[in-house]
Structure formats: structure tokens, C-alpha cells
């Protein structure tokens, strides 16, 4: 029998609101809000690490693209 553990994704895709013109537009604020929302929806640490790694693997546009794959991103 395998002891393989699977990553736990959130129960549903959370929704977060980001004001790109304000301090919310800071990349680290976006990552923090996203991780908090994912965690609150039931994601485990491995899933959060996967998101962070992908989100930080490129430029700001990549961050927004990856983040929108994990959460419903409402941009102001």
C-alpha cells in the first residue's frame, strides 16, 4: 500500500480584490492575500508553496496570470 500523500487544494476557488494602483498592487501583498485566501479555503502548505513558486517565477504580468489561475482576481 502506498503512503503517497497528495497536495490538498482549496475547497473552492476563493475570490480576492486587488487595487493595482494602491499598496495592494505590490507583488508581495498580492502573494500574501492569495495565500491567506487559499489557506482559509483549505489549501495545505504544499499547495501554497506550489503557488508561491509559480507566482515568483517571472515578472509582474506572470504573477497576475498565475494568481488568476488560483483565485478569482478582481482588479480595480
Language-model segments: residues:
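Long, contiguous binding/interaction regions
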Residues: 2-76
Amino acid at each position: 500500500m502506498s503512503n503517497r500523500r497528495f497536495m490538498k487544494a482549496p475547497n473552492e476557488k476563493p475570490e480576492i480584490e486587488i487595487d493595482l494602483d494602491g499598496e495592494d498592487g505590490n507583488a508581495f501583498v498580492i502573494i500574501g492575500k492569495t495565500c491567506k485566501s487559499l489557506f482559509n479555503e483549505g489549501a495545505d502548505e504544499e499547495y501554497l508553496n506550489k503557488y508561491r513558486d509559480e507566482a515568483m517565477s517571472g515578472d509582474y504580468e506572470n504573477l497576475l496570470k498565475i494568481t488568476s489561475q488560483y483565485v478569482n482576481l478582481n482588479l480595480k
